[in-house]
Amino acid sequence: MGEVEQAGGSIAGQVAVVIGAAGGIGRAVAARLGAAGCRLALVDLEGAALQAAARELGLEGALALPADITRAEEVAGAARAVAEAWGGADILVNAAGINTRERTLEDLSAEQWEQVIGVNLTGVFHCTRAFLPLMRRRGGGAIVTVVSTAAGLVSPGAGTHYCAAKRALLSLTESINLEQGKHGIRACALSPGEVDTPLVDRRPEPPSAERRAAMLRPADVAEAVYFVVSRPPRVTISDLVIWPSAQISGKYVV
């Protein structure tokens, strides 16, 4: 049998910025990257929730940086704090996301549209734009944006505004790779199917206990994030889709 080359590498000591780290997928990502030895900067809207997450996860030394990611100046302030603490950044995970109970064009208000687009799309732009210079200081880095299978398969259950924002993130990720690859930046659009997070509680019809039990867990998504960011610099995973087995088999339709 020939020699098998190990494709992964250690990310211990790398600076990882996790957006939306106070709960759900972002919290699970923070836990996974912390376990891998990363130095963590945790960003979310509420400072108290960030502090609680860092404490409960045992993430000693993590920076808790409250910021409204729809406001460019607040995100820029978080980036300055990371630069002052560690000089640069190696990993950015865009994991913040929201939705509203109203999902259809008929039911959505203009304010709800702007709110969801603001966090799920414009917020990712602000975070990526603010932290790119810190990654280029390091000679490169990895950006993972948590998208959704709703980006490719428009779902009335996910909502018009949500699907529109998520599909736009696919194009944003492609643009990052096209424009920033020459600087060693690698971007991935990670699209999970249904994930058991508090976000599903906002559906017009909350899922049954059976359906919820079949969903992905935040830790499943976090493990996929770790896989992407731990590849060597020669490897770019531009698009990764992970499904709950029950959903892709057609048992449950969003």
Label each residue range with its predicted role.
Residues 103-105, 112-114:
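Substrate-binding pocket helix/loop in short-chain dehydrogenase/reductase
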Residues 153-154, 175-185:
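Active-site-adjacent segment of SDR/Rossmann-fold oxidoreductases
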